[in-house]
């Protein structure tokens, strides 16, 4: 895996090099300073709007869990249940198809009951999914039960995509939509980083195993 990642890094350097002369002396630092100043201002405004801060903090955790589950699903079922490459392909296909189909249903549900109730229901489905993945290993349950996990995870992913952004839109005042959606996006990127990092620490450094991660 080292070579592909190294190639991607070199690609970033190569394609960004032509734009480097466009920056005058000090302009980069000025841009970074301005961005950090605006970020601090945006964060300080979060408490002015009820529920927004709690939602963004919560989003770190459920986005972290969802990203990590999808990123390491193939490794988990391969190492813990000995699935073959063909089995893993079928396993992932179940998740993809269930997320596509359920997405339409979640969209209708958001329109009917609102994004908050829908998102809470989605989080319970995520809880059921992770409980199934963990208990199948720790409690020695029949291995065939694991095939229900991609179905549930796909449904939960579809619901997350359908309810997450609309709920943010409900919590955000119209005049600050662009500003707070930048913070919303940053929270998602942060979760994308800490998810795999947490997995590596729990599995490799602490040796607690994949179910614990």
What are these regions (language model features)?
Residues 101-115, 203:
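Helix-to-loop junctions at the C-terminal end of transmembrane segments
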Residues 85-86, 174-184:
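Loop-to-transmembrane helix entry/capping segments in MFS-fold secondary transporters
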Residues 124-141:
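C-terminal ends and interior cores of transmembrane alpha-helices
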């Amino acid at each position: 895996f080292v070579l592909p990642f190294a190639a991607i890094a070199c690609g970033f350097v190569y394609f960004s090099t032509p734009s480097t002369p466009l920056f005058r002396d000090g302009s980069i630092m000025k841009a970074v300073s301005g961005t950090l100043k605006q970020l601090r201002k945006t964060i300080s405004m979060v408490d002015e709007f009820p529920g927004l801060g709690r939602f963004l903090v919560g989003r770190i955790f459920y986005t972290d869990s969802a990203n990590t589950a999808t990123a390491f699903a193939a490794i988990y079922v391969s190492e813990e249940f000995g699935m073959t490459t063909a089995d893993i392909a079928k396993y992932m296909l179940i998740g993809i198809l269930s997320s596509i189909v359920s997405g339409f249903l979640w969209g209708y549900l958001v329109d009917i009951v609102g994004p908050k109730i829908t998102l809470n229901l989605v989080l319970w489905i995520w809880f059921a999914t992770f409980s199934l993945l963990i208990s199948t290993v720790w409690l020695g349950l029949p291995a065939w039960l694991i095939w229900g996990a991609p179905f549930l995870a796909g449904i939960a992913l579809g619901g997350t995509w359908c309810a997450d952004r609309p709920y943010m839109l409900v919590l955000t005042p119209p005049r600050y939509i662009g500003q707070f959606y930048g913070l919303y996006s940053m929270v998602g990127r942060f979760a994308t980083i800490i998810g795999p990092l947490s997995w590596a620490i729990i599995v490799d450094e602490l040796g607690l195993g994949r179910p614990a991660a």
